[in-house]
Amino acid sequence: NNCPQDWLPMNGLCYKIFDELKAWKDAEMFCRKYKPGCHLASFHLYGESPEIAEYISDYHKGQAEVWIGLWDKKKDFSWEWTDRSCTDYLTWDKNQPDHYEGKEFCVELVSLTGYRLWNDQVCESKNAFLCQCKF
């Protein structure tokens, strides 16, 4: 594994939690600027979710929800990953996504579910975030 020390290696990629609170778009830009090819994290296998959840629980300082790279760009429940990978795995929290009040188009890991399940949230909300990179 070629991941730097405080990054989580998984399936050829490296993941890191950042505790700085940012709006979703600013978090995605931060990941992209960190290193070319980095994005907010995308998930594709059931097995990735618990491993990442455990990593976040161990390293996340604070109670904030955590942005991942899923969003509803067209605002019609057609969810897309910022790294343009295939949306083949979704693990929503109960009664989600709901586009509550027609305002929630970005996806966060819910702290009350141990960061295992997802919720759609207002993109301007300030959250911690999870970057995914190749090193």
From Swiss-Prot:
Stated name of the protein: C-type lectin BjL
PANTHER family xref list: MANNOSE, PHOSPHOLIPASE, LECTIN RECEPTOR RELATED
Places the protein is found: Secreted
UniProt-recorded Gene Ontology molecular function terms: carbohydrate binding; metal ion binding
Record key words, sorted: Calcium, Disulfide bond, Hemagglutinin, Lectin, Metal-binding, Secreted
Pfam families, A to Z: Lectin_C
PROSITE patterns listed in its UniProt record: C_TYPE_LECTIN_1 (PS00615), C_TYPE_LECTIN_2 (PS50041)
Lineage start: Eukaryota, Metazoa, Chordata, Craniata, Vertebrata
Protein family (similarity comment): Belongs to the true venom lectin family.
Protein purpose: Lectin that shows calcium-dependent hemagglutination activity but does not induce platelet aggregation in the presence or absence of calcium ions and vWF. Does not inhibit platelet aggregation induced by botrocetin and vWF.
UniProt motif Galactose-binding: location: 96-98
Source organism of this protein record: Bothrops jararaca (Jararaca)
Disulfide bonds: C3-C14, C31-C131, C38-C133, C106-C123
InterPro entries membership: C-type_lectin-like, C-type_lectin-like/link_sf, C-type_lectin/snaclec_domain, C-type_lectin_CS, CTDL_fold
